[in-house]
Swiss-Prot record:
Belongs to the 4-toluene sulfonate uptake permease (TSUP) (TC 2.A.102) family. The gene is yjnA. Its main location: membrane. InterPro entries: TM_pro_TauE-like, TSUP/Inactive_protease-like. It is a multi-pass membrane protein. PANTHER family: MEMBRANE TRANSPORTER PROTEIN MJ0441-RELATED, MEMBRANE TRANSPORTER PROTEIN YJNA-RELATED. The keyword Lipid metabolism does not apply. This is Probable membrane transporter protein YjnA. It comes from Bacillus subtilis (strain 168). The chain crosses the membrane at residues 5-25, 75-95, 105-125, 143-163, 187-207, 209-229. Pfam families: TauE.
Amino acid sequence: MSVSIILMGLFVGALVGLTGVGGAALLTPLLIVLGINPSIAVGTDLVYNSITKLFGVASHWRQKTINFKLVKYLAIGSIPSASLAIGILHLFPAFHQHQEEIIKHALGYVLTLVAISIIVRLFLDRKLRPNRWQLMPLENKRALTILIGVVFGFIVGLTSIGSGSLFAIAMIYLFNMKASQIVGTDIAHAFLLVTAAGILNASFGSVDYMLAANLLLGSIPGVLIGSHLSPRFSPRPLQFIMASIILVSGLKLI
């Protein structure tokens, strides 16, 4: 048992509970700063995220705020794409020999993208008006939805980051859904995606189970504490601060 890792999990969990900002964008760069190899950081974070998102799925299932058809179309694209990204890194010698460097630089670019997406989401929540994409039925957007899954799934498979934030921004813009449905659908799809990617990483030996367990010991109470305190704080300033921190982390890794 590592007290420092548990405390880090508590810190990240509390921030997630307070702001709703994805834990992977905060946790993965922190693990790398602590000296964890990027490939292990990514694999461990995927497993950790799978377990934490399971609780979210159970809650939204009870609330009936999951659009299962949308989850299906996103997963059709994202899970094979994430598997492809992981396979490329581990099965092709040219990539496997340089995977730590590839993952580190990819993390930098994706963290920057995630930070921008969080800021854009703050803007869209206030300013976005109904557009022609939102007015289309889901069946008419099936190919586009699967394509979004392919693109963002590859990113998640490579870096563990974006299973929530990147897909959420796409759902806000493309689908006319209540905020609770966006969150529930996003978490349900993210659970399937990170679980599949986590299992595949585990098969390649890229998961530190003790590290994941210590993180969970801290993050679960952290999320509960953050969620309890969140009504006392305005979420937008906190989310903007977190986006700024993620942006700086990303730029340092590029």
